[in-house]
Amino acid sequence: MNYFELFKFSPAFDIDTAVLAERYRELQRAVHPDKFANDTEQQRLLSVQRTAQVNDGYQTLKDPIRRAEHMLSLRGIDLSHETTTVKDTAFLMQQMEWREALEDIRDSADPQESIDELYDSFAAYRTKLTKLLTAQLSSGSEDDALLAADQVRKLKFMAKLHDELTRIEDALLD
């Protein structure tokens, strides 16, 4: 299913999330199962299925990584069950530095400063990747789509690192 069509957007990485939320509410009102309570069982089942599609579409389009994955899937590149790893040497080196920094936080003289520095580093790198991804997804070229898939892999890794950093920060605050 093309969620961009469902929500009446042109396939693009940058979408107006306020408009997305508004269209989500409109679609929810139109297909909500309560609206079909007195209809046939088939109509009620169809309403439940349609509601699930609307919910999944909304969750997909509001999350930048899932939105990018969806755009790539529409172009025949499925990253959902993939085991391909990032081959970018510079990124792998950066990844190792971040991992070491995560391990060193607890022994740091000022753990919160180390955490803040890592958050800043993640944000700067994520911004750089997002700019590349936006340009690559807007291109119609197959090569750019493959490069965009690499950016998505990197962003997924960074999301895991961010979650790990949040867990470390929460543990230090306890």
UniProtKB/Swiss-Prot annotation:
InterPro entries xref list: DnaJ_domain, HscB, HscB_C_sf, HscB_oligo_C, J_dom_sf
Chaperone found in the keyword field: yes
GO biological process, one term: protein complex oligomerization
Keywords (A to Z) from UniProt: Chaperone
Domain J: 2-74
HAMAP family assigned: HscB (MF_00682)
Protein family (similarity comment): Belongs to the HscB family.
Function per UniProt: Co-chaperone involved in the maturation of iron-sulfur cluster-containing proteins. Seems to help targeting proteins to be folded toward HscA.
Name this polypeptide is given: Co-chaperone protein HscB homolog
